[in-house]
C-alpha cells in the first residue's frame, strides 16, 4: 500500500513523465493541467522556453458557449478543439502529449481525442 496522497502520486507520475518528454520547435509539447473546476492546455516549445498557444475553460470564447461549469467532459472537448485550432493556425501539426501526471481517462482523454479530431497528430 502506498502512503502517498492522491496529489503526491500525481506529482510523482508527472516528474517521471517529464524526464522523457521534451517539446521542440518542430514537435512541441501539449501540456494538460486539470483542476477540480477547470482544465487548461498549452502548446510549449521547451527549447525556446515559451508557450506557443493555449486554451482553457476560462477563455472568453468558451465561457459563453459552455452550458455547465468547466469540470465536464464536454468542456474538455471544447478546450481540445480550441487548442488544436490555435496550434494549426500557427502551423503546428505534430505535438507530444503531456498528460501532466493525470491518468489518461475522463477529462484528459476527452481533451486529447478532441484535439486529434481537430487535426493535431500525436
Curated annotation (Swiss-Prot):
CDD domains: Ribosomal_L18_L5e (cd00432). GO terms for cellular component: cytosolic large ribosomal subunit. Residues 1-26 are annotated as: Disordered. Gene3D superfamilies: 3.30.420.100. The keyword Transmembrane does not apply. Part of the 50S ribosomal subunit; part of the 5S rRNA/L5/L18/L25 subcomplex. Contacts the 5S and 23S rRNAs. The gene is rplR. Keywords: Ribonucleoprotein, Ribosomal protein, RNA-binding, rRNA-binding. Belongs to the universal ribosomal protein uL18 family. Residues 9-22 have a biased composition (Basic residues). It comes from the Bacteria. GO terms for biological process: translation. This is one of the proteins that bind and probably mediate the attachment of the 5S RNA into the large ribosomal subunit, where it forms part of the central protuberance. GO terms for molecular function: 5S rRNA binding; structural constituent of ribosome. It comes from Prochlorococcus marinus (strain MIT 9313). This is Large ribosomal subunit protein uL18. Pfam families: Ribosomal_L18p (PF00861).
Amino acid at each position: 500500500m502506498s502512503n502517498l496522497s492522491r496529489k503526491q502520486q500525481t506529482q510523482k507520475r508527472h516528474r517521471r513523465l517529464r524526464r522523457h518528454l521534451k517539446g521542440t520547435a518542430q514537435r512541441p509539447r501539449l501540456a494538460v493541467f486539470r483542476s477540480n473546476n477547470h482544465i487548461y492546455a498549452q502548446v510549449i516549445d521547451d527549447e525556446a522556453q515559451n508557450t506557443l498557444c493555449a486554451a482553457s475553460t476560462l477563455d472568453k470564447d468558451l465561457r459563453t458557449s459552455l452550458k455547465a461549469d468547466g469540470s465536464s467532459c464536454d468542456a474538455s472537448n471544447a478546450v481540445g478543439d480550441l487548442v488544436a485550432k490555435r496550434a494549426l493556425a500557427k502551423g503546428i501539426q505534430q505535438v507530444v502529449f503531456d498528460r501532466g501526471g493525470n491518468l489518461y481517462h475522463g477529462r484528459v482523454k476527452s481533451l486529447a481525442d478532441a484535439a486529434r479530431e481537430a487535426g493535431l497528430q500525436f
